[in-house]
Regions:
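Membrane-interface helix starts
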Residues: 60-73
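Helix-loop-helix hairpin linking two adjacent transmembrane segments in secondary transporters
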Residues: 1-31
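Short linear capping/connector segments at secondary-structure termini
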Residues: 42, 74-76
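C-terminal transmembrane bundle of multi-pass solute transporters/carriers
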Residues: 52, 56, 63, 77, ...
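Short, conserved catalytic or interaction motifs in soluble domains
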Residues: 20, 35, 155
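Flexible cytoplasmic inter-helical loops of multi-pass small-molecule transporters
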Residues: 24, 31-60, 275-284
Length: 300
């Protein structure tokens, strides 16, 4: 996100140099960090084996726990929707609707980055909702509802900047909340296997979203939203017509779909039960850790 902001000022070569430098700094810091070996759990000892068998353990662990499985599927769908719009067509839409104004695109990317930083600072100060699942589903719904809708109807830089801020400020609460849930619910010596499977499945369709986003924009929505197009008379009042309008309509669809998916999580019994349960009644009763004392457990 910050790279998009720097692009207009320093050029692509300097952006790549800065990107490489950040990787080197991160690797250098990690070289001096001591990572303690986690205490072995009974399930962790029982699951030791070959690489493929340990990978299957990660799948089986998630599959046996409906709450974690539901959270995984919800984030899977959210990442898919985000890759259809934010990750693939947002720069093209801004350029199309701003007359190829690179400075406008850089400003939008800057606010996206700044919004994420502000959200992270708020999260570190406040800590987020007491029940973390509220932060995941509630803030995710707000991000789709506010950010996507404003990107859909916006046709000027001020509206896009507000949309970028509304989108990005909630992301740390979403990602931080769901990571907290997984780390609380999975034994420490199993987290490598389980979280690797979780990350792989959540991100599995992101490349597909990249491909579909461009194809849908170029072949379906952009032609349909041109003057006289098949959808122009129906949605033109909302997102306008002409260059970028079809991509604006795509943001409208992800706004509706993403908000409904997040709100539907409240209707899924294992997640709904975790919202209503008392202290320690977290996401999945079936995977509570007996070795974790009550005062160490936070409601999600």
């Amino acid at each position: 996100l910050i790279a998009g902001a720097l692009l207009a000022w320093v050029g692509i070569q300097m952006v790549l140099v800065i990107d490489l430098a950040t990787f080197l700094i991160s690797m250098s810091i990690l070289a001096f960090v001591h990572i303690p070996r986690p205490q072995q759990s009974a399930e962790g000892r029982a699951s030791r084996g070959r690489f493929l068998s340990e990978m299957r353990i990660g799948f089986a662990y998630i599959n046996r726990r409906p709450g974690l499985r539901g959270l995984l599927l919800m984030m899977f769908a959210i990442n898919m929707l985000a890759s259809l719009t934010y990750f693939s067509i947002l720069p093209a839409m801004i350029l199309a609707r701003s007359g190829q104004n690179e400075w406008a695109l850089g400003m939008v990317q800057s606010v996206l980055g700044a919004g994420g930083v502000v959200g992270a600072l708020l999260l570190s100060t406040w800590g987020g909702p007491r029940k973390k699942i509220h932060g995941v589903m509630g803030f995710c719904a707000l991000s789709f509802l506010l950010g996507d809708s404003l990107f859909a109807v916006g046709r000027s830089l001020p509206v896009w900047l507000v949309a970028a801020a509304c989108t990005a400020v909630f992301i740390p609460f979403i990602s931080g909340g769901q990571e907290t849930i997984w780390q609380l619910k999975v034994e420490q010596d199993l987290q490598g296997r389980v979280l690797a499977v979780k990350d792989a499945l959540q991100q599995f369709f992101i490349p597909v979203g990249f491909l579909l986003g461009g194809v849908l924009a170029d072949r379906v929505f952009e032609p349909a939203m041109r003057a006289g197009g098949s959808l122009a008379s129906t949605f033109g009042w909302l997102v306008g017509t002409g260059p970028g309008a079809g991509m604006g309509l795509m943001f409208t669809l992800t706004c509706i779909s993403g908000t409904l998916i997040c709100l539907a999580g409240y209707l899924y019994a294992p997640l709904k039960g975790s919202l209503a349960g008392p202290l320690g009644d977290i996401l999945d009763r079936s995977c509570d850790h007996p070795e974790v004392s009550q005062h160490h457990v936070q409601p999600l």
